[in-house]
From Swiss-Prot:
Component of the Mediator complex. One of its GO terms (cellular component) is core mediator complex. This is Mediator of RNA polymerase II transcription subunit 6. It is found in: Nucleus. The keyword RNA-binding does not apply.
Length: 216
């Protein structure tokens, strides 16, 4: 039986499985998935589940009896909060304060015999924000070359005509991507005041703090 991972180990980076246990039990089911989970390093032997298992080792509790017993105890518990057998179970580690109140601590997924620890809200939000920032910065880098300055209109943003992107590759040996890049560089731009309104407003706010170019 697993003794749990050391405190210094990042459990969110662990994928755990024990196929020989699953095979010996004839597959995973809702009735035995908590027992399977107890073999993993995510499990705590100081939990109420472990105490009840030791007390009833000669009279195994079914899932209904286990949940009923856990509700009468306070402390750390592991319960199934969602199931879609035979492929998915969601297990919650919680601190039960009383019969009607629990404090969720961590969520785990049992998916195709693999057990994962779900990331916390901070990690999930930080990752999403990092990805969004990267994509936004990449977009700004691409549109940075488009602004055109006019002393009467300020900064304007032209629209690329799709007709100028059609290139005949039948009589050339150059790759299609290279020809497309050349066509974009040599394309004829047309501007509509309604186009890129959001981008235009944002970019104008960036340029407003810069000194306008000298006009002779």
């Amino acid at each position: 039986m697993a003794s749990g991972a050391p405190p210094s180990v990042d459990l969110t980076s662990i994928q755990w499985r024990m196929p020989e246990w699953v095979q010996s039990m004839g597959g995973l089911r809702t009735e035995n998935v908590l027992e399977y989970f107890s073999q993993s390093p995510f499990y705590s032997h100081k939990s109420n589940n472990e105490m009840l298992k030791m007390q009833s080792q000669f009279n195994a509790l079914d899932l209904g009896d286990l949940n009923s017993q856990l509700k009468r105890l306070t402390g750390i518990q592991f319960v199934i909060i969602h199931e879609r057998p035979p492929f998915l179970w969601v297990i919650q580690k919680q601190n039960r304060l009383n019969e009607n109140e629990v404090k969720p601590l961590t969520v785990y997924f049992v998916c195709n015999e693999n057990i994962y620890m779900a990331p916390n809200a901070y990690t999930l939000l930080a990752t999403r924000m990092l990805n969004a920032t990267y994509c936004f910065q990449k977009a700004l880098t691409k549109i940075e070359k488009f602004p055109q300055y006019n002393p009467q209109e300020g900064y304007t943003y032209p629209k690329l005509s799709n007709d100028n992107l059609e290139v005949d590759h039948s009589n050339t040996n150059e790759p299609a991507d290279e020809n497309k890049n050349q066509s974009i560089e040599n394309a004829d731009y047309s501007f509509s005041p309604e186009d890129f309104s959001v981008v235009r407003a944002f970019m104008q706010s960036l340029h407003s703090s810069k000194e306008a170019p000298d006009v002779k």
